[in-house]
């Protein structure tokens, strides 16, 4: 417990002193206001607490898989259809939880496009079998933005075993095996990674499947809210084959003078003929933007 920091509550009375395990997720100011992690609070006496209003809006739906396509070598875009007339009332940057029953999944059954199969063969991934003997629940950020109604879009990276003694990712293995028409149970919405209502410059930094909340935020700001705040998006990938939604972000940059986006490749391939930024994205944004920024501390990240 205490590792994800998602179960924040405000304790008005009771609950005892805040624990060291909580301080990595809660600032000193928040602690003074009674903020705690519910999983770390021992209930020994009567308590009074305050919950965010959004919690009471959490619902559960059985969705249908519309598509489950590779967007990169190890990343799928899972697109789910909500029941007719239903919608998830979420804020950009929010997440849902997805349920998986006990299952046995053979990686050989995954639908992987030919252009990506070479890497899967190289690492022997099609030989993996994921056996899960209990129900599993995992959280994923939504890649769609609130005005994309009636559906849920997720970017999921397969969690392959780091060694022979460690099992494959229970949920990612389940998700990678989903096919159009399959039924999936989700619940939500949840989240705290929301844009603040200020005029501050926004700097979005992400890589890999971390694309999901970036897409949600940026599309929401530019397509729905029509913000004029200065915005930049810095995305890291291994090679051009691992970059997705490129045409969408190119179009947004062309349509909005206040938005630019940059890609940095850590391992560009010879056929990429890459002339852009290279290296890891956190180093690239520092060296090429934040190092000489007038007031990086004033930006919203």
Swiss-Prot record:
Cofactor comment: Binds 1 [2Fe-2S] cluster.
Location in or out of the cell: Cell inner membrane
Catalytic, as annotated region: 199-301
Domain of life per record: Bacteria
Reactions this protein catalyses: a ubiquinone + n Na(+)(in) + NADH + H(+) = a ubiquinol + n Na(+)(out) + NAD(+)
UniProt binding sites for [2Fe-2S] cluster: 4, 7, 39
Limits of the FAD-binding FR-type domain: 58-196
UniProt keyword annotations, A-Z: 2Fe-2S, Cell inner membrane, Cell membrane, FAD, Flavoprotein, Ion transport, Iron, Iron-sulfur, Membrane, Metal-binding, NAD, Sodium, Sodium transport, Translocase, Transport, Ubiquinone
EC number: 7.2.1.1
Lyase listed as a keyword: no
Gene Ontology BP term (one): sodium ion transport
SUPFAM superfamilies recorded: 2Fe-2S ferredoxin-like, Ferredoxin reductase-like, C-terminal NADP-linked domain, Riboflavin synthase domain-like
2Fe-2S ferredoxin-type domain residues: 1-45
Known function: NQR complex catalyzes the reduction of ubiquinone-1 to ubiquinol by two successive reactions, coupled with the transport of Na(+) ions from the cytoplasm to the periplasm. The first step is catalyzed by NqrF, which accepts electrons from NADH and reduces ubiquinone-1 to ubisemiquinone by a one-electron transfer pathway.
The protein's assembly and partners: Composed of six subunits; NqrA, NqrB, NqrC, NqrD, NqrE and NqrF.
Family the entry assigns: Belongs to the NqrF family.
Protein name in UniProt: Na(+)-translocating NADH-quinone reductase subunit F
Organism: Shewanella putrefaciens
